[in-house]
Amino acid sequence: MSSPSWSGAVLALDGTQPLERELVGGKAYSVNQMRRLRLPVPSAFVLATPLCAAYQDNGGELPAGVWDAVLAQLATLEQATGRRFGGPSRPLLVSVRSGAAQSMPGMMDTVLNLGLTPRLRDVLAAESGDAAWAADTWDRFRRGYGEIVLADPDAAPPADPHDQLRGAIGAVFASWRNERVRAYRTRHRLGAGGGTAVTVQAMVFGNRGPGSGTGVLFSRDPSTGEPCLFGEWLPRAQGDDVVSGVATPEPLSTLAERMPGIHAQLVQTARTVEADLRDLADIEFTIDSGHLYVLQSRAGKRSAAAAVRIAVDLAREGLIDPATAVSRVTREQAETLAAAAGVRASVDVVATGLGAGPGITVGLAVSDTERALALAAAGTSVVLVRPTTAPEDVPAMFDSVAVVTDLGGGTSHAALVCREIGLPCVVGCGAGTSQRLDGRTVTVDGTSGRVYAGDATTAGGASSLDPHVEALLELAGLAPGGEILDPGHPLAPFASRGSP
């Protein structure tokens, strides 16, 4: 029997043909869809999800024919950008990104600025007249490639950019089997899954100069559901600086002040993507020398309260029907809202930051992830307190009752994960907060952004329903209060909560 041909599993993301999310993964699907919508998206192609298992089954090598297909797509990127991958002048740099069918923010690996060498760094410096930018871009690539592909941040990347690309593709495929992916898929009952795709995209540079930056925006507030643009950005930075939480970003209001034209484009982009998704849109963007580029989009992770309000508002706006609105709220989210607690007055505030994951809970502050896992396994309610969270912290986050960080913003991966699983989260509390809180019992209010000394909670389960919950029950054809729900219904936790 002849072996299958895999050359057709490397696909252009040019928006000219519809693609299946299961085949190309969520990231590539969004790139292709946004190209179809004529948004400013850098050129890209994808190695489809079946290649992930094929790569593993082939002993960590790409199947026959795949590399030739990759080179053919690289030639298309070169033509689109007017640059040459590994070329002696006007070098093309690319990002190599993961993307499973189900969104798993930050769980798998990404390599940025790929295609650089010390010689090409100098070419970039001469071409741009900005030696500092070229050096920063090289340093970012060298460290990132060493950490992700070579498992040694001090190791030098291969001298040939094509060898760099082979290595990065393999590293992204291999990241499908890492511990944080397993923990995430187990927590969300996603099963084994079909593997990750690999998206190769032409680089744009938020770290280039004063007219550059990077950020994340949501078409609505993912914590409250309020119908207003929410997001953060960092000038002269690349995307990982925002989502990793290693820096505390600025609100979009400062972008509106400095670059009003770019901000206006983002407002329209959010409307366009939300209308296409018919859901809360989470959009990653880069500004390169005054030009806006959209890198990816997806349905945004949201808090329980936001899930209810967004579902109701989208139904009222005619973007979704009542049945879809009801299906957008999970049993776990309903339980979170039904058990909401409060905070007693006159309790000492021991830390203040940005409330990034609504909810109130109490636990023992622990700064070491291994100790946090051990204490949680023994039955202790753990509040994970960290300078910032890395993807490796995800298993400890899942076993904690809240997360508090020194650095980071509301669009960091820590905030996204916490909102998705209903975990109270406060970010950006200031340097030294995690050390200061370690070992103390604290109450975390992820709505207000405050951390209190000791157990400051009051009893949960207030008698009245939030008006958006009442509206959701009405969309479901149910009356608030009364005998309305089968115990197995996702909205059953609201059954004992009536109107005043």
For each of these PLM feature ranges, what is it?
Residues 352-383:
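Phosphate-handling DNA/RNA-contact segment within nucleic-acid enzymes
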